[in-house]
Every structure is written in structure tokens, then in C-alpha cells.
């Protein structure tokens, strides 16, 4: 698990079903530096602590993900499944995740273990960020748990093990 880095910043990425207005409104003019990566989002005045980037993909995206403190996925509609790829990538890089409630986030995030699932309320988001910034044990525990979950459940090696197990069971039934 990497240190949080010299310049601590929060990363938010993706475009499907995101509510970046909520994120900007909640964290604008706070001490937290925020980087939003989305070709689909613009804001006329996000505040001096929030930067919006377009056309960030591949290696540049992974570089920013590796350097961030944590990842926020603010979802617009709780009934729509979204954010899974960002969840997996954050866990791959051992980054705690803060996300707003939805019907499917619990398939990836266990609140208090590898991230925080919050109601879409300004104070709830600010409190979640504050907790990760101030509580080193919580931060490191969530980072480690997220990385372990990724390796155990979502990595190429874990998928290969599961596929191999299925093939072995199918092969045993032939005899």
C-alpha cells in the first residue's frame, strides 16, 4: 500500500450515472483537493480546490489513480447500476472508495471495510472524506482490504482459478 503522496488529492472518474454536481457542491472551497476525470462533465465555477480533466485514459488515468488518496464515485440514480469498473480499479490500486448508496454498490463495497457507502448528502460526504484523511488506521485498513478483495475475487489469476475449478468439475462428471 503506497503512501498517500506529497500532494493529497481525491479522484473521481467515469461518466455513466455520475452526479458530479453533488460532489462539487459538497467539496467546493474545502481543504480537500479534488480531480474529476470525465469527458461528459463541465462546471462553470468548481472552486479553486477542484480540477476537471477531459481526455484522461490509459496510462495517464492509472498514474493519477496510483497517486490519489482515495476515490469518490457519486452516483446520480440509485436504481441504475454504475461505477463497477472504477470500484475494481480503485481496489486494484489499494484506494479506499467513497460512494453514494445504490442498489448494486454492495456487490463491491462493504461499508467500513474497503470503502464507505454514504447517503447523497453534503455533510455525509464531507464526514467520509474527513474520516479517511484523519484516521490513518481506517485509511490503511480500507486500502489493504480493497486490494485483498481485488486479488481474491477480481484479478485475472482469481478468475483463472475459478474457471479451472469449473472445468475440473465438468471433467469429473464425464467419467
Feature map (PLM): residue ranges:
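Acidic donor-binding loop of glycosyltransferase active sites
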Residues: 65-82, 95-96
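Short hydrophobic faces within alpha-helices
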Residues: 23, 89-91
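A short, well-ordered alpha-helix in the C-terminal region of glycosyltransferases
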Residues: 124, 131, 138-153, 159-165
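Conserved catalytic-core segment of nucleotide-activated headgroup transferases in glycan assembly
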Residues: 3-59
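Short acidic alpha-helix that forms the nucleotide-activated donor recognition element
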Residues: 57-68, 92, 110
Amino acid at each position: 500500500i503506497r503512501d498517500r503522496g506529497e500532494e493529497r488529492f481525491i479522484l473521481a472518474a467515469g461518466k455513466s450515472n455520475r452526479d458530479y454536481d453533488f460532489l462539487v457542491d459538497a467539496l467546493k472551497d474545502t481543504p480537500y483537493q479534488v480531480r474529476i476525470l470525465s469527458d461528459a462533465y463541465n462546471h462553470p465555477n468548481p472552486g479553486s480546490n477542484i480540477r476537471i480533466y477531459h481526455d484522461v485514459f490509459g496510462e495517464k488515468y492509472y498514474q493519477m489513480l496510483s497517486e490519489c488518496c482515495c476515490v469518490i464515485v457519486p452516483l446520480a440514480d440509485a436504481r441504475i447500476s454504475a461505477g463497477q469498473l472504477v470500484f475494481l480499479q480503485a481496489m486494484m490500486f489499494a484506494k479506499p472508495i467513497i460512494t453514494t448508496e445504490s442498489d448494486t454498490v454492495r456487490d463491491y463495497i462493504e461499508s467500513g471495510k474497503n470503502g464507505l457507502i454514504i447517503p447523497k448528502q453534503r455533510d455525509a460526504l464531507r464526514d467520509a472524506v474527513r474520516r479517511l484523511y484523519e484516521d490513518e488506521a481506517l485509511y490503511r485498513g480500507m486500502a489493504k482490504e480493497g486490494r485483498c478483495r481485488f486479488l481474491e475475487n477480481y484479478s485475472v489469476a482469481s478468475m483463472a482459478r475459478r474457471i479451472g475449478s469449473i472445468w475440473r468439475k465438468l471433467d469429473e462428471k464425464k467419467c
